[in-house]
Amino acid sequence: MTDPERTIAAQATAAGQGAIAVIRMSGPGCMDILKQCTPAAFTERLRPRRATLVCIRDAEGAAIDQALVTWFPAPASYTGEDTAEISCHGGMLVTDRLLKRLYQCGASPAEPGEFTKRAFLNGRMDLTQAEAVMDVISAGSDLALKAAQSQLDGGIGAQVDELKDNLVHVLAHIEAYIDFPDEDISPDTASDLLARLRNMEEKLDTLLKTAEGGRLLREGIRTAIAGPPNVGKSSLLNTLLGYDRAIVSNIAGTTRDTVEESIQLAGLALRLIDTAGVRESSDVIEQAGITRTNRALETADLVLEVADASTPRVKDFPAPVLTAPRLLILNKCDLGIHPDWKAVPGIRFSCATGEGRKELEEAIIQAFSSSLPGETGSSLVAINARHQHELGLCREHVRLASESISRQESPEFTALELREALTHLGEITGAVDTEDVLGAIFSSFCLGK
């Protein structure tokens, strides 16, 4: 539980040695704490949102560091509370001593995500925006960053608020019939309310369809590179990365384990997984590698099946039943295409010359064009798993409310479903919250955020 009377402090920049570090402090005791560790009258020189040079001192008056203090008085701060950001030299000893001094003067160590949690609790942002802060920090691609920034700007929250307003409108009409039970819902009114609810169902469906794209943006597209031994899987990994990551050899079975690296492709994050060649083998270690290959294939979002197009075609490599899209890469085409492969649809590719790379990139983008979130106005909308859960429940209650009106049931039943739908919308933005939900969200943040 966050105590608003507690003043918290933590390092906002990454731990370790660097040129500059930033210590963030927030809470009602900020000014008193600064007075204790700076020269007399320093705090009188502080001006809102301006950096002021000062020497931070320990309890004996000895200098800890020359620092710049930027003062953000409430409510115009990140957290909505009095906040100070101390920019000091980035040595680990300096930041450690400075934090200890702040704690000695009355500050408490911040919990992970506590600054952003306070911003939410103080109304500086809704819960979707608070989640977006972490998405911005962890974004692994241009599209993921764009979606996170859209959410931080209130893109999802605005759509949820619009749905909420429509639900409140319908509920107000239903409540009126509860208050005046002698009147029945007229056919025209029922038709209008049903049209509104069905429109909401369509909007909810549109939002729910962005969940898979949101997962791909946040986690990256798991792309397994698979095929028989010695067809150039590791060479393909190295080619896409632009450097030698995997060992390449003409000896079959060189790759015994999965090798995973990430790249950005046309704004998308791809998690490339080089796998062991699949074949019948009595080698225990190679069998273990093949087991891992099958596991990677089962969990992949995309499979790049590599074949040596310069040699005769053999039977397809044994693999588990796949649900992921599959692209056939006809590798080593610089050595000539064997007649067996000439009529086979696939991407002609050469790790030696780079031929086919553009075609491969276009094919990958095309494979996910329908899954990735699209623009809604000027926003890129991509809900997360929590949003998906609550929106799904909301949609079910909207559907039940529609059925209740259609069956001309007592308005109390319709109102009950509408209130439940509103509750689930409120869970998304934090208008309705539980401490368990907040704890789960903010515990994934870093200390200084």
UniProtKB/Swiss-Prot annotation:
Record-linked SUPFAM superfamilies: P-loop containing nucleoside triphosphate hydrolases, TrmE connector domain
Stored CDD domains: trmE, TrmE_N
This enzyme's EC code(s): 3.6.-.-
Binding positions (K(+)): 230, 249, 251, 254
Residues annotated for (6S)-5-formyl-5,6,7,8-tetrahydrofolate binding in this entry: 24, 85, 124, 449
Cross-referenced InterPro entries: G_TrmE, GTP-bd, GTP-bd_TrmE_N, GTPase_MnmE, MnmE_dom2, MnmE_helical, P-loop_NTPase, Small_GTP-bd
BP GO annotations: tRNA methylation; tRNA wobble uridine modification
Cofactor(s) in the UniProt record: K(+)
Tree of life domain: Bacteria
Residues that bind Mg(2+): 234, 255
Protein name in the entry: tRNA modification GTPase MnmE
Gene source species: Akkermansia muciniphila (strain ATCC BAA-835 / DSM 22959 / JCM 33894 / BCRC 81048 / CCUG 64013 / CIP 107961 / Muc)
Highest classification ranks of the organism: Bacteria, Pseudomonadati, Verrucomicrobiota, Verrucomicrobiia, Verrucomicrobiales
Gene name linked to the record: mnmE
